[in-house]
Amino acid sequence: MDQIRRLLLIFTFFFLLGSVPCLAFECHVLDVGQGQSVLIEADGHYMLIDGGGRDASSFVVSYLRGIEKLDCIAVTHYDEDHYAGIIGVLKTMPCDLLIVPSYAGEGDLYESLAAGALSNGCTIIHGKSGMEFEVGGADVEIIGPTRLDYPSENDKSLCFRVGYGENHYLICGDAEQEAELDMVKSVTEMFSDVYVVNHHGSFTSSMDTFLDAVNPEYAVISCGKGNAYGHPSMETLQRLQNHGVDIYRTDEQGTIIAHSDGYDIWFDHVASDDWVNRPMPVGEKLQEVEQQEKETQAYTYVCNTNTKKFHYPDCKSVNQMKEENRLFTSLSREELLAEGYEPCGNCNP
């Protein structure tokens, strides 16, 4: 009788054990404000895709505390709000592999990234469409960009499709309409259960054709509360709603975690019912923007005296230049070319 009772207890234990979902995979979309950072955890292995901006660096480093090593860190593109936070991670945590875009960045921030990677000792590779690798039991494929001659640096963002069991997750940095359409034309399989919304929910991304191909059940928007860009845009929110997607928002809900056992996906938050964007901030922020506009009207181009390239004042590369290399000028394009300067390949002045 005792033996039968023991057998029943053992059977019950394993039955209950089998009925509890295994937290084998997690996708963390970190609350880094107006930026993006995604942590993939698969069977005790880790991949960090982007690290948010400078202001988020200490938060990201703290969030990763307890992880002994990162299998991989990836930079989708060289926007400050996506890769500045990675520098602190490289300084504090061992990493096997650093994946960077197939074009070079500029300025102090880029040099700090290169120095951090060198100090860390990780292997550095340039990500390209079609590249595949594993993180634990997760399969990771780079599906974009499909070309590198885009005028916008956003469209050059590395795009990662992560598969675990029957579930898939899509993270594409700041990819916009042109890159999205090229992926739809070129990539065989784009379906993803969870879509980390491109470019923080900008109206220039998440077009209907792209959403048709991805066909997500869940979408996570990473953006800062009350950000100056109006992210997420009403147009993008409407498109997501029209596709019947459940949305999660870091600006409203903080860090979002999607759990999976390879079959089912569940979140640590209920889906957001906030289908409106945040209004443009006023007051001090508006005054700051107006002052910047006045300053940029005083000159035509900004030159990098080190690289001998000239840029539009609002080019992202301008903020990354060293102060001693930054030259403001009202010279014409022809005059700058005559002096040996070349136009920036990103802003195409």
Across the structure, where does each feature detected by a protein language model lie?
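Bacterial N-terminal signal peptides
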Residues: 8-19
